[in-house]
Amino acid sequence: PTGPGDTINIQGVYTDGATRYNISELAGGWAGANTVFGGTSLPGAYQSVGFGFAPDSVFAVGTQQQLIQTWGMRGAYTHNWDAYWNTAIYGAYAGVRYNGTAKSYICGPTGSGVGGSFGAAFGTAGLTSCNPDYNIAQLGLITRWTPVKNLTFSADVTYVHLDQKYAGTITTSSGSIGKPSATYELKDQDTVQMLFRA
């Protein structure tokens, strides 16, 4: 059931070399970079990590830019309880795809990480799959209270799932990911955040 002023919004998007129009709000950070840490049950691993990078393009010295393709959709339903309160449920799902040449710049010519930028940064000894493609999903609920005009308080809970395609382990130096020098398991990550705004 809907009430006066309720809204339903749905959007779909496809980009080719314009990733920020799709991914930046989902992944956040520089160039849509999403690096998420979590727990692990892998013996010898310090933590787990998931990578989702979404630049507009990638290139190597002396080569052409390889455009990154993305697709996605998002939607929301807002219900107005009365003139002061409303609640919205929202969600989004997006995919980031690198072409074969772009993948070779990152994962090397054989896709093993050897000879690519990922292997150079994180090593390849424990890497079992090198693939920069990923999907990201988001589901959230926000409630807003507007006691007077131009003043709104809100509480927003968001769940995000990063479905990344790297597998195996990496061993890092402390500066490369801002964590202790250790072994990290590569795997999908889930996060929940709550924001209070005024």
List the model feature ranges, each with a label:
Residues 188-198:
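Outer-membrane beta-barrel "beta-signal"
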Residues 1-2, 78-84, 144-150, 160, ...:
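Structural signature of outer-membrane beta-barrel channels/translocons
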Residues 140-143, 149, 154, 192:
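Mobile, glycine-rich extracellular loop/lid and propeptide segments
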Residues 120-127, 173-184:
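Flexible, solvent-exposed loop segments that connect beta-strands
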Residues 150, 154-177:
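C-terminal beta-signal and adjacent terminal beta-strands/loops
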Residues 80, 132, 146, 187-189:
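Surface-exposed coil/turn segments at beta-strand junctions on protein surfaces, enriched
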Residues 21, 147-151, 187:
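Outer-membrane beta-barrel biogenesis signature
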Residues 1-139:
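Detector for outer-membrane/organellar transmembrane beta-barrel domains
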